Amino acid sequence: MSVRNIFADESHDIYTVRTHADGPDGELPLTAEMLINRPSGDLFGMTMNAGMGWSPDELDRDGILLLSTLGGLRGADGKPVALALHQGHYELDIQMKAAAEVIKANHALPYAVYVSDPCDGRTQGTTGMFDSLPYRNDASMVMRRLIRSLPDAKAVIGVASCDKGLPATMMALAAQHNIATVLVPGGATLPAKDGEDNGKVQTIGARFANGELSLQDARRAGCKACASSGGGCQFLGTAGTSQVVAEGLGLAIPHSALAPSGEPVWREIARASARAALNLSQKGITTREILTDKAIENAMTVHAAFGGSTNLLLHIPAIAHQAGCHIPTVDDWIRINKRVPRLVSVLPNGPVYHPTVNAFMAGGVPEVMLHLRSLGLLHEDVMTVTGSTLKENLDWWEHSERRQRFKQLLLDQEQINADEVIMSPQQAKARGLTSTITFPVGNIAPEGSVIKSTAIDPSMIDEQGIYYHKGVAKVYLSEKSAIYDIKHDKIKAGDILVIIGVGPSGTGMEETYQVTSALKHLSYGKHVSLITDARFSGVSTGACIGHVGPEALAGGPIGKLRTGDLIEIKIDCRELHGEVNFLGTRSDEQLPSQEEATAILNARPSHQDLLPDPELPDDTRLWAMLQAVSGGTWTGCIYDVNKIGAALRDFMNKN
């Protein structure tokens, strides 16, 4: 195409052009003291605010910063002018506007800035997944820089929904120790009537390839799953869990997580959150007073009670780090998961696969917290963004009209009793719900690993609560090669899949949801286990062991496994103990002792083809090095400036 063609459709209107304008009427509310003592940036900021059309006489009011992961471009009719990367951030402008209107009505000055986010669902199985986890640190850093760019802000309100943008936003808010901050969860997308949820629909390719879904059904299911244009996915994945954790931290107002996006209650949550931020600012209650060690432990407790995503093992420590709190250790997670029962029955864990909006209607986080309070598992004296303690919030919730009316709506509209979604501890135990997370160790994972043990298919667990699988390994150096074999009928019941080289150094610690989701929804999948140094989507279920340490590219034993090796997996889902061990090879006439097997594995070289993915971006390579120096996955893949600085100084001194 020539330059002439590019400009071929010019309108003659372009030649009607102004080169001057009158400028805003009125005067800035300046005083002699302001002109003498305030920096020029403050004064010029007022000039620009007037230029954008704000009433000049209102410009010396307290600034409240709205920070969002908004994406896409909505027309006046709500239809897309430009598509977003996911529906989770597509409607956030509605919540932003609702909050801004409250701020203005209360004689403060709202500002809005944006750092949009990617979609883990969109990037599954693509090189885009190499940027997924690293994005979180980068986005949080940009958000913190934006917040500091309005240095006189009296409060910051974060509005976010999904897998990486929401943790990044919470990290950014957690770092604002000396001002008020509030998180507005972006809610959940509505489930489709007679449609599949957003987790199951991501398996249409694998099910079609295995003859378990017709082409026509795949087309229909793929079109229908997202029944509304906003909110995070309908399951308790990383997005939904992060919303729940925000409430558990006291960083979001009560009963705000998992609200149905676009509905009146969802808008009101934004308005109420703005009122909360203004109240905190007026009372002088800062983030440092809300995000404490006790608040972090409450969030971990709520995570366990909901059966949350294993990705929060990466995000909660990162939030704690930014808040200046104790970073939870594996021992902390084990301690909490051993004492906290899972109480919530939603996708993907079950036993009944309710969409997360049903958990909101059943009372959401405060309802779960009432049960946890009855067990003495919460720190009720913590301060929250309401300006009241958690105890005061729960006392209000227990007797609120809101609680009763939403439960009744769930019964009237869906014929579902709220107690079937959020169970009492006694009912949960009777239904066979187990605690959420187990950390297996063994000669394959000497530094540990993670499994969402509560999500293993119950039919695969014996009467003592034990999942046991001894089988032959099939080793893959990429998720792509594993999913190829799944789609081409090369995986059979009883296999143990091992995907190596997909930890932080290999692929940015990508999610392997293509594999885990296929195993969940294929008829033979419950008889297949997975071991990997990658991580999992929050919607993953089954006998899937991830976060294996050390990772293969750091010389970990997992990188020394070969196809044909015999592996034993044992998970005690009640006592939360687990082992994952190399036993020998399929050709061994007599298996070696455990000690001998460990020595054999350790003596092997790593797989000869083990390398970082050739398409791994330099940005992600840098992230992998920085987070490794800072403590790695068990400290949340954070950037610890002191540790990074010490490592650089040590390197320079040696060279």
From Swiss-Prot:
Q: How does activity depend on temperature?
A: Optimum temperature is 30 degrees Celsius.
Entry keywords, A to Z:
Lyase
Return one Gene Ontology term, BP aspect.
aldonic acid catabolic process
Activity regulation remarks: Activity is increased in the presence of Mn(+) and Mg(2+). Inhibited by thiol compounds.
**Comment on pH dependence:** Optimum pH is 8.0.
Q: Phenotype upon knockout?
A: Disruption mutant has reduced ability to catabolize D-xylonic acid. YjhG-yagF double mutant cannot use D-xylonate as the sole source of carbon.
List the catalysed reactions: D-xylonate = 2-dehydro-3-deoxy-D-arabinonate + H2O
Return one GO MF term.
xylonate dehydratase activity
- Function, in words: Catalyzes the dehydration of D-xylonic acid to form 2-dehydro-3-deoxy-D-pentonate.
The entry assigns this protein to a family as follows: Belongs to the IlvD/Edd family.
Designated name of the protein: D-xylonate dehydratase YjhG
Q: Which organism is it from?
A: Escherichia coli (strain K12)
